[in-house]
């Protein structure tokens, strides 16, 4: 078992008076890819956004409980959210490159950190794009707009942008749902490679994707964590009937 890297304890989230997360206790280990599954509106994306305080940007949200990362509660008063999001990066459902060149997209976070050395920036661009399995596609287009790329290429550039600041954890909110099967397959293969270096937590509606590439799976339903275990156990021998019914397609 890997070393614990981030965990939530008794995490509740309310949109106004509506309780969207009902006391979630969950621990993630270093170097593992965890899939979070469940029907739409079950709380999995809401939970994911709690792990780097993205929900702070939503009006009328109340959060109680704790999320402990590197021994500190990220909801404590001394947390710098900008620094936190460099260490716990996020990739969204829709590719969201900035309206800049591919090169400027990748080094965006490094520029924020004050990095100016061209050699350092050049190396970071190549290393990150290679890690995101898109270097060969874009190496001759580095100074063209990232918006001119295909959807799959844009998503991989967004992943490279996260990798460039060398995070500990990468959060992925349905990163392949807007892409065609070929692009999705490329991203899945890339995630399997990245798992050797990063901890990843991924929301997905794709059951076969979760079973193929994740080490652990968490099943959410109506704001509750129903089951969390090794992926093989969740899919082949779930402990809870609700998990079995969801995986077998009886609801969702």
Curated annotation (Swiss-Prot):
Location of the ABC transporter domain: 6-247
SUPFAM superfamilies: P-loop containing nucleoside triphosphate hydrolases
Keyword Translocase: yes
Protein name per UniProt: Phosphate import ATP-binding protein PstB 1
GO biological process: phosphate ion transmembrane transport
Organism: Enterococcus faecalis (strain ATCC 700802 / V583)
Function (record text): Part of the ABC transporter complex PstSACB involved in phosphate import. Responsible for energy coupling to the transport system.
Keyword annotations of the record: ATP-binding, Cell membrane, Membrane, Nucleotide-binding, Phosphate transport, Translocase, Transport
UniProt gene name: pstB1
A Pfam cross-reference name: ABC_tran
Main localisation: membrane
Family the UniProt entry places it in: Belongs to the ABC transporter superfamily. Phosphate importer (TC 3.A.1.7) family.
